[in-house]
Swiss-Prot record:
Residues 258-285, 439-452 have a biased composition (Low complexity). It comes from Schizosaccharomyces pombe (strain 972 / ATCC 24843). GO terms for cellular component: cell cortex of cell tip; cell division site; cell tip; cytoplasmic side of plasma membrane; plasma membrane of cell tip. This is Cell polarity protein mod5. Keywords: Cell membrane, Membrane, Phosphoprotein. The gene is mod5. Coiled coil: none annotated.
Length: 522
């Protein structure tokens, strides 16, 4: 039964126009323009367009000139009876007012409505059926029974249609949209709801996410091993769980059996089995084994703590990370079943230390909790310092620094305090002995300053070249020696005074390094 059939439950203005409502003016419940309002402003009576030529009515109703099947006789555009008449009062053709009659293929070329992206049917010459509708109408409209009941006839009426059951208009509007956008469902997609993603998509996304998470955990464990490899007793290796195994609980927790229960070891099996898998020959029923494994994995009690540092060798590290995945996917562990680990005691038996291992069962994805807490316990602070980061001290650092400083116990009071001792710091860059450099605190040498070998009894009170050179000598590293035979004023930019200064100054005797140090300290 069509949505537009005669029924008193449907409002009258939603019924098809084949009823008596089409003979009367449009009811006041809706507001809309007439398609054929050629007589706007005139006193001529309005003729229902269903009795006229449907093509002419459609051409005059649109607000753009369209080609006609008849020959144009040169009639005026303003002539209401002409074929090229354009109605300036009609609504413009927008996406909400697209109206295509059932016989548009007869009078227009196929490229007329190319802007609407209308999908025409494959039949080139549509054949008319008994009730006047074409086969193309049936293919676009829907079922032939729905077409025969009169849902199509509302398109040929005099008034603007206001029905909700127009399947054809919905398809035309969908065809006019751009369906090439990948993020949206195209109009060809038939689904109950676009928000319901199918289960295979969800499964594939979940598998991808779990595999990616497994790779991230492997990278994290590699970084962890690199970070703790310099410790005194680093963990030997980190056993990784397989996360994307089917029917595996997530996150996988390491299974450690309780202290009062020793799991039955199957010595007959060639391969070590995980502890959480119940052995059929075990006297313990399978349900209690699963319950104990779940309780050990989920429950966290702070009294559980690894017992001894000496017992956490490679065997206990291998058996401390038993996870509940399949036998075939599980790597072969050598001593997995040979040693049970009941080494858990209460915290009151051990001295209270700063323990980082607050959640002993919580780090299934990085490493075994015993190995991590054991490596972190080697980082305990010194007993006398309250800081968690102990100061890094080396045994021979201060001795090396003190050996560079010249020791003079007798002449401590005569040391010039204004001269800093840079012997234990970074040495100044080595200067070639041909061009002497001077310290920044002393002035540059001038010609008025007396030379080195003048025979003056005492050095002057003003800072002279000799004082500056001795200060610079104290700043230099001990392996750098300076030749003082050259004149001090040779670095002056005046080239004329160089030969005269060389002839005036007698050569100075070069002293040994010990004499220079004594001169500095005196």
């Amino acid at each position: 039964m069509s949505a537009l059939s005669e029924s008193p439950a449907i409002p009258s203005f939603w019924r098809p126009e084949t009823s008596e409502i089409s003979k009367k003016p449009r009811p006041n419940t809706t507001v809309g323009f007439q398609f054929d309002n050629r007589n706007v402003g005139t006193s001529a009576p309005s003729t229902p367009a269903i009795r006229r030529n449907n093509t002419d009515s459609f051409e005059r109703g649109l607000s753009l000139p369209l080609p006609s099947s008849k020959q144009d006789t040169g009639s005026s555009v303003l002539d209401p009876d002409g074929d090229a008449y354009v109605n300036r009062y009609a609504r413009p053709v927008t996406a909400g007012s697209i109206y295509i009659p059932s016989n548009y293929h007869k009078s227009f070329s196929p490229n007329t409505f190319s802007g609407f992206n209308v999908k025409r049917s494959a039949s080139k010459s549509p054949k008319r059926s008994a009730n006047g509708s074409t086969s193309e109408d049936i293919s676009i409209e829907g079922s032939p029974s729905e077409t025969a009941k009169g849902a199509r006839s509302s398109f040929n009426s005099n008034f603007r249609t206001f029905d909700i059951g127009s399947e054809r208009r919905r398809r035309i509007l969908e065809a006019s949209q751009d369906s090439s956008r990948p993020g949206r469902y195209s109009y060809r997609t038939k689904s109950a709801s676009p928000a319901l993603i199918d289960t295979s998509t969800l499964d594939s996304r979940l598998n991808f996410t779990m595999g990616r998470l497994e790779r991230s955990i492997a990278q994290l464990s590699k970084n962890t091993m690199r970070a703790v490899s310099h410790l005194e007793n680093p963990p030997k290796d980190i056993t990784l769980p397989k996360l994307n195994v089917k029917n595996s609980a997530w996150p996988l927790q390491p299974y450690s059996p309780p202290a009062n229960e020793t799991p039955a070891s199957s010595s007959s099996s060639a391969k070590a089995r995980p502890v959480s898998v119940p052995d059929m020959s075990s006297p313990v029923p399978a349900s209690s084994v699963e319950y104990e494994s779940l309780k050990a994995a989920v429950t966290y009690s702070p009294s559980q703590n690894p017992k001894k540092v000496a017992e956490t060798d490679s065997e206990s590290r291998k058996s401390s990370f038993q996870s509940s995945y399949n036998d075939a996917d599980r790597p072969f562990q050598v001593g997995a079943q040979t040693q049970s680990t009941p080494n858990r005691i209460s915290r009151s038996d051990s001295p209270i230390v700063y323990d980082v291992d607050t959640h002993s069962e919580d780090n299934a994805s990085t490493a075994s909790s015993e190995a991590i807490s054991q490596s972190m316990r080697s980082f305990q602070p010194q007993p006398n310092t309250g800081s968690p980061f102990p100061r890094f001290t080396s045994t021979n650092t201060e001795d090396e620094q003190e050996s560079d400083i010249p020791q003079s116990d007798a002449n401590d009071s005569t040391v010039n305090l204004n001269q800093p001792n840079y012997a234990n710091l970074t040495p100044t860059p080595q200067v070639s002995p041909k061009r002497p450099t001077y310290s920044r605190s002393s002035p540059l040498p001038s010609a008025s300053v007396p030379a080195l070998g003048d025979g003056s009894p005492d050095p002057p009170a003003a800072p002279s070249i000799q004082n500056s050179l001795s200060v610079h000598e104290s700043e230099m590293p001990p392996h750098v020696t300076r030749d003082y035979t050259q004149p001090a004023a040779s670095a002056t930019p005046v080239p004329k005074e160089k030969p005269s200064e060389k002839s005036e100054k007698p050569p100075k005797k070069k002293g040994s390094k010990l004499e220079k140090f004594c001169c500095i300290l005196m």
